[in-house]
Design a protein with these regions (language model features):
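A general structural motif at alpha-helix termini
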Residues: 28-31, 174, 325, 339
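Membrane-embedded alpha-helical segments of integral membrane proteins
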Residues: 1-48
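Phosphate/oxyanion-binding loops and surfaces in catalytic or ligand/nucleic-acid-binding neighborhoods
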Residues: 40, 287, 312-315
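The AdoMet/dcAdoMet-binding core of the Class I SAM-like
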Residues: 131-287, 293, 300-302
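Soluble small-group transferase modules, centered on the S-adenosyl donor enzyme superfamily
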Residues: 52-150, 155-157, 197-200, 214-223, ...
Length: 422
């Protein structure tokens, strides 16, 4: 029993993170040969004592050891494509590259460059970030939809490092003095650095502190409060992530916000079901009743949304947003790269608010720590392909947001939002 416990700990927390699963398999093959040789030696000795001079030749233990060594020698290395793509391995072409592959104690991490030239960041076999235009837009907006609506943010907590693109967008705001990135897997850092041209070298910013910790543990134990907390874990059906979409998690997030603070949450509408999305919305809106939904898809159809919540209803000041966009060339360029050039174009991504969705969410349960139903409900719908109808139902009762600013800008925004002009 002691050996089994020590073996599992050594393999999980030292051998695989230090040398990889391929070397772990080879080592286990050799150890199996050694174990067999030890057992055979004991058996041979027992037979010799029992036979007392019998001419029967024992099987030499070196045969067992040799088989173990041979097995280790012929075992193929674990292909990077399996670590990166999981069930989506059929996406990979022969000319694709894997400039970074690493295995940690918490997850496997890989960067895959496809034939189209775009980089894909993978964690435990699932794409978590890319630099293709549609995903880059989402990743940037997680940052900018936090930074621009807040009138004077100074401190930020980013839950989940990913490609560092959301944190990088927030690092462009001169008023933000401190950014804490909480990441459970240290091996992610190597992958994040490969996105430096898109994340503005965020890991080298003097504003940034990287904390390697479980997000729930960090939030529960830190005394620090933040103006902005962004949460961008991977899909809730992925092992261990549903707990970052629970009522208790959002309660901790709310308690760690400074007065006037904002929390943002990425929610994918693909690889899930409408019931799962309703549970996510109901849970978030339980902590932030006046939360808002923002669609990051340039076409206005369903793909990803970002939730923004705070203690008070969100007030959108178009003039202040435009001032901050136009006076900071870095922020302007960051938004322009994802086809946004001013406040009206940004707020044109607005979808709905918590009160707008009350009828849609009526009777829906919430995700709790002691009943993580979301993990299983979303996992049953990986191939559902319901993103467009989910978003349409979500915003069916939408009303015009709380917007102030130049009357001409407000009128243009009203025409776009209520006239469904993208």
């Amino acid at each position: 029993t002691v050996g089994a416990i020590l073996g599992s700990l050594l393999v999980s927390f030292w051998i695989i993170p230090s040398y990889g699963s391929s070397w772990a398999e080879k080592l286990l093959a050799v150890l199996a040969g050694v174990s067999a040789a030890v057992v055979m030696t004991a058996i041979n000795q027992a037979k010799r004592r029992a036979a007392r001079g019998s001419a029967e030749a024992p099987i030499h233990p070196s045969w067992a050891l040799g088989v173990g060594v041979l097995a280790a020698a012929v075992l193929p290395s674990f292909p990077p494509v399996f670590l990166a793509h999981g069930r989506y391995i059929w996406w990979v072409n022969a000319q694709d590259r894997f400039p970074y592959v690493s295995e940690g104690a918490a997850s496997t991490v890989a960067v895959h460059v496809g034939s189209d030239g775009y980089r894909n960041f993978h964690v435990s076999g699932r794409v978590e970030a890319t630099d293709n235009p549609s995903d880059l837009r989402t990743e940037r907006l997680i940052g900018h939809l936090s930074g621009l609506p807040h009138p004077h943010p100074e401190s930020v907590l980013v839950v989940g490092m990913g490609g560092g693109i959301s944190a990088g967008a927030l690092s462009l705001y001169p008023e933000i003095k401190r950014i804490v990135i909480c990441e459970i897997e240290p091996r992610v850092v190597g992958a994040t650095r490969l996105f430096a041209d898109k994340n503005y070298h965020v890991l080298d910013s003097p504003k940034v502190e990287v904390v390697f910790d479980d997000a729930r543990h960090f939030l529960a134990t830190t005394r620090e409060k933040f103006d902005i907390i962004t949460s961008d874990p991977i899909h809730p059906w992925v092992r261990g992530n549903s707990i970052l979409f629970s009522k208790e998690y959002y309660s901790i997030v709310r308690d760690r916000l400074k007065p006037g603070g904002l929390a943002t949450q990425w929610v994918p509408l693909y690889e899930t079901s409408e019931l799962a999305i309703k549970i996510q919305m109901k849970t978030f809106m339980g902590a932030f009743p006046n939360g808002t939904v923002w669609n990051t898809n340039v076409s206005g159809k369903g793909y990803d949304v970002v939730l923004v919540g705070g203690e008070q209803p969100l007030k959108i000041d178009l003039d202040d947003m435009d001032r901050r966009i136009t006076q900071n060339q870095l922020i302007y360029d960051s938004l322009a790269e994802v086809k946004i050039h001013n406040a009206v174009e940004l707020v044109n991504d607005y979808g709905a608010s918590g009160p707008d969705m009350q009828a849609w969410l009526e009777g829906v349960p919430v995700n709790r720590d002691f009943s993580l139903k979301l993990e299983y409900i979303s996992g049953l719908a990986l191939n559902a392909g319901e993103a467009d109808p989910i978003y349409a139902h979500m915003v069916a009762g939408h009303t015009f947001p709380n917007v102030v600013g130049n009357p001409m800008k407000v009128a243009e925004l009203r025409r776009r939002l209520l006239g469904n002009v993208r």
